[in-house]
Structure formats: structure tokens, C-alpha cells
Amino acid sequence: MDQANRKPEFRFEANEYPLGPGLRLLEASAGTGKTFALAHLVLRLLTEGGRQISQLLVVTFTESAAAELRSRIGKRLEDALKGLESFQHQSAFNSPDPVLDQWLLQQGSNSSKRNQWICSLLEALEGLDRADITTIHGFCRRTLRRQALESGAAVDPRLDRSEERRVGKECRSRWSPYH
């Protein structure tokens, strides 16, 4: 491919990515650090963004990916908490990666923010098991359950995998008034 037809490269900077309102899509090839980036963005949303873990929705494709995300987010929050606490006690903390080191240097020196963020991270870690870190299907299932009372739908909806049964029922409902 010649230079004229090349797409410009986008380098994702986890500490610079905007946190403003709206949807975010993180899309990249396998092994490029999506889980790492998401875990760091969750950290930033909980601290810099002032969000609570219950306000976030993290969706992926498979159960194993959701479990890995939950684990990595928890680890990231724990590492950030240790780093912020080391600033509080003026002791050295070597984080496991340069992105977290940079974040701690940029953000950790402000003592009023730091104390607030320590509390926020502790609360987030306590609520991590209940956080919306799920698959697309899990998100839909949970949304249907939450909306069941308002919509009058079943509280625990089941997916009808029988195409014939569904088509037959639909045909009978449409044709029965005429026969």
C-alpha cells in the first residue's frame, strides 16, 4: 500500500483520552491492549470523572472476556489505590506499568483529590462484584429484568430458540380471526 492510501495511525493514550459524557467504543485487534485500556479508563472515570462503579457499563462478547475484564479492573483499582496511599504516606511506590506511573505522577500529588479518590476506589472495589461488567446478552437480560415491572413482561424472560414454534404461533394469531 502506498503512502497516499494509508490510513493515519491513531495512538491511544490512556491518560489523555477524553472522559466527557457519551458513548465510547474501544476497537482494536487481538492482543493490542483493549482490556488494559478499559481497566485504566474505568480507573480514570471513577477518580477524575467522579463516577461511581454502579454508573458504568462495560460490555464485551464472551463470559470469559467479562470475567477477565472484571479481574483486570479490580487489579487496576487496587494498584492505583496502593499508589495513591503511598503518596499519602510519602513512601515510594513502583507501579507495575508506566501508564499507571504517569497517572500517579500527574494526579497523585493533589492531596485533597487524592484522599477523595482513595475513598472512591475503596467503594468501587467493594461494589465490583455488582458492577455492570457483562456480555451483550447479559446486559440485555439484566435490562429486561429491570424493566419487567414497568413493561408488564416476565421478570425472568427466556429466549425461545424454537423457530417453528414461534412461526406457528405467529401464523395462528394472524390467521385465526379469518377461519
Language-model segment annotations:
Residues 11, 160-161:
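Ser/Thr-centered flexible coil motifs
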Residues 1, 163-164:
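Extended hydrophobic/Leu-rich segments
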